[in-house]
Amino acid sequence: MESLQRLLQGARMGTGMMGDQPLVDNSECVYISSLALLKMLRHGRHGTPMEVMGLMLGEFVDDFTVRVVDVFAMPQSGTGVSVEAVDPVFQKNMMDMLKQTGRPEMVVGWYHSHPGFGCWLSSVDINTQQSFEQLTPRAVAVVVDPIQSVKGKVVIDAFRLINPSTLMMGQEPRQTTSNLGHINKPSIQALIHGLGRHYYSLRINYKKTELEEIMLLNLHKQPWAHGLLLENFNSAAEKNHASIDKMKSLSEQYTERVQNEVTLSPEQLRIQYVGKQDPKKHLDAEVQKCIDNNISSMLACMLDSVAF
């Protein structure tokens, strides 16, 4: 109660005292390394359908840059909408062991997963972020969706809380000094859950070194002789039958979805399939995969018949 009275008293005194205080700039960017991003996605996928969380290691380079170089998972149990608080004993032991392996970076924030329901902060997440910002005012909360994330597009966002005193005094939570911090269109779920009122979104970028680019290009790369291997005909026939059955099921799902879209309003269509499987995309991918496998097996069979 006393803190609320002091806050109201400061608001009545005017905004002149708040004018000289440093404000967060909207061009502030969070740079996440490839290693940290892969670890977050893998941790989130393994925990599906439950939420998982972990801590991010890095440094605050300047007033506009937060660099995340690595992450590690926390042994927290989660539900469908929240995760528990951080275990300080595990965090201290993990930080000590990481320093011995040449990882002296500090904790710059935390991450957790929202499997299938978008990137936003719940009330429990806001309380967790408040505890982080009490220790480090510039701490960042990263939310990743491992279900909606696909190859080439990661559903991820970074947030930080808005000081309630700035809202009471009618001030903007961030100042604008450049056009670097362009505003990404927020999702409806994030706006409903307090984006722009209780917390704001930070820009995310990914910096890759030459070695990291080589590592990512070779991540799922097959050797040159892999395409010349001739698969067993029985196993290839079984795969083709399974692929055809899957394509039949996906085509039925897509037909049913198209028929249902006629009866839905535009507002219902906007949120009807959020976090659900898109049968059309999966059908295209399955057809392309089946064609590629059959073409490569036919070419390998022809080469083997000519060579041997």
UniProtKB/Swiss-Prot annotation:
Keyword Methyltransferase carried by entry: no
Keywords attached to this entry: Hydrolase, Metal-binding, Metalloprotease, Protease, Proteasome, Zinc
Positions annotated to bind Zn(2+): 112, 114, 125
GO biological process, one term: proteasome-mediated ubiquitin-dependent protein catabolic process
Protein's UniProt keywords contain Cell membrane: no
MPN domain ranges (all copies): 30-165
Stored SUPFAM superfamilies: JAB1/MPN domain (SSF102712)
A GO term, aspect molecular function: proteasome binding
Pfam family, one: RPN11_C
One GO CC term, this protein: proteasome regulatory particle, lid subcomplex
PROSITE patterns listed in its UniProt record: MPN
Tree of life domain: Eukaryota
Motif (JAMM motif): 112-125
InterPro entries attached to this UniProt entry: JAMM/MPN+_dom, JAMM_MPN+_peptidase_M67A, MPN, RPN11_C
SUBUNIT field: The 26S proteasome is composed of a core protease, known as the 20S proteasome, capped at one or both ends by the 19S regulatory complex (RC). The RC is composed of at least 18 different subunits in two subcomplexes, the base and the lid, which form the portions proximal and distal to the 20S proteolytic core, respectively.
Family statement drawn from the similarity comment of this UniProt entry: Belongs to the peptidase M67A family.
Function: Acts as a regulatory subunit of the 26 proteasome which is involved in the ATP-dependent degradation of ubiquitinated proteins. Transcription factor pap1 is controlled by the functional interaction between the positive regulator pad1 and negative regulator crm1. Both these proteins are also essential for cell viability and for the maintenance of chromosome structure. Pad1 is also responsible for resistance to staurosporine, and other drugs such as cycloheximide and caffeine.
Name of the protein this chain belongs to: 26S proteasome regulatory subunit rpn11
Biological classification of the source: Eukaryota, Fungi, Dikarya, Ascomycota, Taphrinomycotina
